[in-house]
């Protein structure tokens, strides 16, 4: 086995946001040397990595030359140049997850076709090359209102997703490649994090339940374990494992799903990296998702995925009407609460609904944890000076 610890081994991370920063907690723990590439000079990772490089994640030469300096390359954001990654792979560089996996996941249309091809349950959909093509599809009754519109590229944290109820809603849409997806009448939005090592060892975390902000379409609460029947949880895990095996990914794969009114499980989308739905694991699990991702991409034994205690994550996002230098109002009040741990991401500027941090609540009783989470949400505010 290669010596990754206290050695000359170099791990490259594409993207220097909060996910990378939290991954660096564990590279520090194991004394793994890290190089990070990010376009922002104020990226959260900058203070915690060994070497920071400012540069575009979409520029071929920048990504290729960065990748040549390191031994293994991973990423914390999907919007990276896959052609540069593919060239590095051809030259023998280790890239996890692979450029092939990432290329499918980068495009929501390609992702949906992948599910169809691999008999993975997902909502019915149609692909459209532009807005005119979509309008034609509605006129020809190929798409029925209402439906969920998704941009095939670039959407995240609720961006690039709209509920379309009328022609007026269509008129407001950008002229981009998109998919029109059937509206699902669902009970719950669930997620399962699957981790797969280079050797093919696979483990899954418990099913989590996600509660969304009604306007921003962002996750407000992640609840582990999900408050669902065991048979539904078992179905969700099986579907997530099927998705993982189809992709043959290496590292973390977060699989977001719908639980329908009749308890079917439908895959919504996936993320091939540490994910918002797994942040609770830092305090609540035997092995957190960031350490687990490192273990997988370095082909080390995977850690236990069970929870030590129930956990709920509350996202901290910028308050409406506030843009500028950030202030975490009342943070000292939530720090007095038992089992409450805030995480601040290191973004200096706030704006409405921008993810600025999260808070984890741990408790033996998940219903009690949910009450505390509500109290946390109503106490702390992310505002500007």
Residues of each region from the PLM?
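Anion (oxyanion) recognition and catalysis
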Residues: 28, 89, 116, 143, ...
